[in-house]
Design a protein with these regions (language model features):
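Short beta-strand-initiation
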Residues: 1, 23-25, 94, 111, ...
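FAD-site-proximal beta/loop scaffold in flavoenzymes
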Residues: 1-78, 173, 177
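Flexible, glycine-rich terminal cap/loop adjacent to redox cofactors
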Residues: 4-6, 104-109, 119-219
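A short alpha-helix-loop-beta-strand transition element characteristic
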Residues: 21-25, 86-97, 122-126
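Short secondary-structure boundary/capping segments
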Residues: 38-39, 98, 137
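A conserved FAD-binding loop/helix module that cradles the flavin
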Residues: 49-112, 199-218
Length: 219
């Protein structure tokens, strides 16, 4: 098997034909209403969404390219409401994702340590491993959670998960922390998880990863 990861590039043919503004990341520039710009001014009745637009980042100042189906649906809803005469705004994105490869679910949100370094953000990461169910309960699968935070502000900037099941719910939980600007300390104080042996451990692995992160931040 050969896996070729080539990335995604926005098709800007229509944007170029209309003379709309394109940003530094190669995506169309839009307002929070998803309305397009031309020479720095909003263009009446032209709304864009999806792979070809730059979105506001929830992690750092400035735009990002969130070329994901979930982002496109969120932006498309806002564009449609405003195009029909309603009022709606699109907020910042953390770009959560999940993939299934064989028996593994791999998920992430926000910035990886490598991408954070590229943006000039020094991060510290905490990691923990456990099971998706109580250790004594049959059917659970191994689960590893990694959480990264800005060393200075201690704000959570990203997370990654590898599991046999239930990665989506956990990454959505951590995405909320990224979007809200929660620090590692606040997450550890405020986070709670539902518990039932067939469905979870009594203390979720994400909380254990946050404990490890706080220890490393304090070193």
């Amino acid at each position: 098997m050969v896996v070729l990861a080539t990335g995604v590039r926005a098709n800007l043919d229509l944007v170029t034909q209309l003379g709309l503004d394109v940003g530094q990341l190669g995506g169309a520039v839009v307002a929070p209403t998803m309305q397009a710009y031309r020479r720095g001014r909003l263009v009446p009745d032209v709304f864009l969404a999806g792979d070809l637009v730059q979105s506001e980042s929830a992690v750092m100042p400035g735009p990002t390219m969130s070329q994901l189906g979930s982002s496109a649906v969120k932006e498309g809803r806002v564009a449609g409401i405003n195009a029909a005469g309603g009022k709606a705004l699109s907020g910042p994105v953390a770009s959560p994702w999940v993939s299934v490869i064989g028996d593994l679910q791999i998920a992430g949100t926000g910035l990886s340590q490598g991408l954070a370094s590229w943006y000039g953000i020094e991060t510290v990461s905490g990691k923990a491993a456990g099971s998706t169910r109580a250790r004594y309960y049959p059917g659970g699968t191994p689960l590893t959670v990694k959480i990264s935070a800005d060393r200075v502000s201690r704000r959570i900037v990203g997370a990654q998960i590898i599991a046999g099941e239930d990665a989506t719910g956990r990454i959505n939980w951590l995405t909320a922390a990224v979007v809200e600007g929660v620090t590692a300390d606040d997450f550890l104080v405020r986070a709670e998880n539902a518990y039932c042996p067939p469905a979870s451990m009594v203390q979720d692995v994400a909380i254990k990863a946050a404990e490890d992160l706080c220890r490393r931040l304090n070193q």
